[in-house]
Amino acid sequence: GFSIRAFGAEEQSVPNKQSSVQDYPWYGYDSYSKGYPDYSPLKTYHNLKVNLDGSKEYQAYCFNLTKHFPSKSDSVRSQWYKKLEGTNENFIKLADKPRIEDGQLQQNILRILYNGYPNDRNGIMKGIDPLNAILVTQNAIWYYTDSSYISDTSKAFQQEETDLKLDSQQLQLMRNALKRLINPKEVESLPNQVPANYQLSIFQSSDKTFQNLLSAEYVPDTPPKPGEEPPAKTEKTSVIIRKYAEGDYSKLLEGATLKLAQIEGSGFQEKIFDSNKSGEKVELPNGTYVLSELKPPQGYGVATPITFKVAAEKVLIKNKEGQFVENQNKEIAEPYSVTAFNDFEEIGYLSDFNNYGKFYYAKNTNGTNQVVYCFNADLHSPPDSYDHGANIDPDVSESKEIKYTHVSGYDLYKYAVTPRDKDADLFLKHIKKILDKGYKKKGDTYKTLTEAQFRAATQLAIYYYTDSADLTTLKTYNDNKGYHGFDKLDDATLAVVHELITYAEDVTLPMTQNLDFFVPNSSRYQALIGTQYHPNELIDVISMEDKQAPIIPITHKLTISKTVTGTIADKKKEFNFEIHLKSSDGQAISGTYPTNSGELTVTDGKATFTLKDGESLIVEGLPSGYSYEITETGASDYEVSVNGKNAPDGKATKASVKEDETVAFENRKDLVPPTGLTTD
């Protein structure tokens, strides 16, 4: 069957087919078939679409190019698809030969579809006929999903030029567009960058001999019918919930049970989930929410609940004063996905045989690099690269690549180990002002300094604040080994360091408003301060941190009891005891320990006490693994037993005690008949 779609005065049919394949309800087809305007079976065009039971159709592209295209809409054959989220993991799983060397497969595809047909958000496709624009976009998609070979875009579409009779103007526009679509650097300066919440959908084919599809936009689960108004869109805001251990941002904290509940507004069902290694992404309608921790991971305490509000695509956090303020905590969607490196091939590096050169870069998602500065000087700088970042050395000791999470640089203070400032806002102001006047990109110079010197001066000025670097001890630092190479700086460069600090200390506000910050996936590496800001790459994150639960030492009770028996025993007599205590490592214990009758003071491992019949001394808080020696004195005229065993020396001993212990002393004294006398 067919539904009807209207384009002005022209009406065209939309396929209305129902799937016979369970779990694969979406119909994928090539709409370039009989009835298409100017259709010719001799032309090799394709115009792929997906729809659901005759719904509105959505523009689609295919990947896995060695497999079949979907059949034409007038074919007796039909291909059925399952809709999936357009995540990096799904792309990699479903693509046969993806181009993933830069780790940005999803971002590259999103960029192509944002700028390709039919979206064309930056006018790259302007002047190109629709079917030709589809051809360009499809080839750009294959470049990344299938690693298709494109060596020179100026020679692209040679076969199509003949088959489709392309004129020279169309051909030139197509080649230029293809070049811009596949090269991230070509679009880095365009006014409209890909938003952080931009999404699309993947369609997995039920028949593995046919290509999978991806849509040029996000496709709803329940699409409207042709001619129907789409359902009123409930604006939702993407938020990621991430769990960290306080003070450790090298990985996400897994295993906490969290609850997200909407307390004002509607449209969100309470969600209980476990924290994971990437964060929990949720789409939230406007309203007020509470994130609470139901169960922390072992060894951690329960975090304080976080109340936040979603309004007009903004996230507001309730602060300690009870006010809602805009959330400043924004992070990249995929944690620890950014690479950074120390460029050993930088011109001028070590050219004067001094090791003050600091050539650190982070890779932006558009393929460019930005200058970055280190933070926490005694940790590792970024891993080394000898080919300008094309290949970056892994960390052999940790057997992994060092990667970074890109976050907004609003709260640098919590990452600093030894900051000079004690106020977070002042600290951030000083860093921003150093960046105002410091080295930010290639070509920056200052006075007579080389670029390497200017860059080193900027790094040292940053260390002055982030690490409390002492500029007077650069040469004597670390047993005269010097402060991270800065001891080699000449007087002119050091003078610029002081100039930067003087500027940072004045009362004017920084010109730098925001900056990127990069947090490593290893606590052995320095975090990185960026010199650029890429807000479109960031998404709101609700970050909940768990404090490690205080370690409560395992302790034990020692109960010493006294029983006096026998026909002539004195049950009112107080018997004297001396106790010697040692820790698990054999050292004498000293301290005051609570008992059932006050406190027992132990000095150099020794204490004394008295007990009479029916009494017990219960000593609490003794460390696990301790040893004791208890000796009763002044009972030589009694038979002494300990825990039912004869103890003529009146002693009880035990080593490595790891549980509660009871030591029962019994003193017995009976009348013994004189020798030779008998009784009748």
Curated annotation (Swiss-Prot):
* Motif, VPPTG sorting signal: chain positions: 672-676
Using the UniProt entry, state the residues involved in the cross-link Isoaspartyl lysine isopeptide (Lys-Asp), renumbered to this chain. 243-546
Q: Where is this cross-link: Threonyl lysine isopeptide (Thr-Lys) (interchain with K-? in major pilin subunit)?
A: 675
What ranges does the record give for the region Disordered, renumbered to this chain? Answer: 217-236
Note the superkingdom of the native organism. Answer: Bacteria
Q: Which residues form the propeptide?
A: 676-680
Question: How this protein is processed and modified after translation, per its record?
Answer: Proteolytically processed and assembled in pili through a transpeptidation reaction catalyzed by a sortase, which leads to a covalent link between Cpa and a major pilin subunit.
Establish whether keyword Cell division is in the entry.
no
Covalent cross-link site, Isoglutamyl cysteine thioester (Cys-Gln): 62-211, 374-526
Locations of Basic and acidic residues compositional bias?
226-236
Q: Please verify whether the record's keywords include Ribonucleoprotein.
A: no
User: Cross-link Isoaspartyl lysine isopeptide (Lys-Asn) - where?
Assistant: 562-667
Which ranges carry the CNA-B domain?
Answer: 253-311
Subcellular locations according to the entry:
Fimbrium
CC annotations in GO: pilus
Q: What are the entry keywords?
A: Fimbrium, Isopeptide bond, Thioester bond
Quote the subunit structure annotation: Monomer.
Q: What does this protein do?
A: Component of the pilus tip. Can bind covalently, via its two reactive thioester bonds, to molecular targets from host cell surface and can thus mediate adhesion of the streptococcal pili to host cells. Lysine side chains or a carbohydrate with a free amine group might be candidates for Cpa binding. In vitro, can covalently bind to spermidine, but it is unlikely that spermidine is the natural target of Cpa.
NCBIfam families this protein is in?
Answer: pilus_ancill_1, surf_Nterm_1, TQXA_dom
Q: What protein does this entry describe?
A: Pilus tip adhesin Cpa
State the species of origin: Streptococcus pyogenes
